[in-house]
Amino acid sequence: MIKNYKLLLFTTFTLFFITFVSGSSILKANFYYKVDWENVQCFVPPCPKYTIQKLNTNEKSQKILDFIFPNGLNKTTLLGDESKTLIVLGTTQPSSKFPNNATDFLVTRVYKSLPLGNKQTSTDKYYMFGDNGTRCKTSPCPNIVAALLNVHSQEIINTISQPYEKNVGFLDSVWLSSKNIRSDDFGLIGQGTIKNGVISISNSFIYLPDPPIKCPELPLLKCVEGNSMTYSRDENRCLVSPRCTKFGVCTLSIPLCNKGYRLVSFPSTELNGCPKFFCDPEFVNKTHK
């Protein structure tokens, strides 16, 4: 009886998760696409410079004139050559400028690849990940659902292996790990290959905007002499838990960030008021200095 109930619970979750990641919970016409761009020159409009390719399929690519993005996104990181780093969820529609001979793309969600991933392999596919509810006393534990985007197919895996902690200095591993497995819309898309229960990610695509929620406003504390305001940083890169901390002895070394990343710091409670440094992707919103 208990075994059958667990099987029913797992099956129900699985069906829900496949529906969620396929985009059919929004509109049946919504699919995930990789974007490409070429700076072609045309003598007569319209002049579509973008193409989209439906993920995990062999369908023919489509030419796109314009993208219609949701409000609140920094479009300078999304258009032109930058668009080659995007995955978009949405649907095509007739162009507002040339309805009879051009196509626009109405974007529901947009994801951008983290710089300095690994070179993609011929076996890589695109996945999103969920928790299947399995709990184990030993590891590895097969508790991760890897759902193939645009395809009603999935695999159960035990490990998500990211390349970025090796490739990028001072990356916030808590921030990245929090995006691997989510129950909301804000999880990452992983391009990778599954073997023996492990997916080796070549590139991760981050949901935009990031963070997806507004950081909380913090009170301004009055600290006694010899103390200063310090913080922690949560999985959304927001400063939290302000407190007065006695000054510590700080090192003077300041790290350099890899290309595509910017240096940020904050007075850390963990480091007794000394600055804690991270290298955040340049395309995410700043949450502090």
Curated annotation (Swiss-Prot):
Q: Name one GO cellular component term.
A: extracellular region
- Leader sequence residues: 1-23
Provide the protein's localization: Secreted
The lineage is: Eukaryota, Amoebozoa, Evosea, Eumycetozoa, Dictyostelia
- Protein name, as recorded: Uncharacterized protein DDB_G0275255
Carbohydrate attachment residues: 74, 101, 132, 285
Keyword terms: Glycoprotein, Secreted, Signal
The primary location reported for this protein is secreted
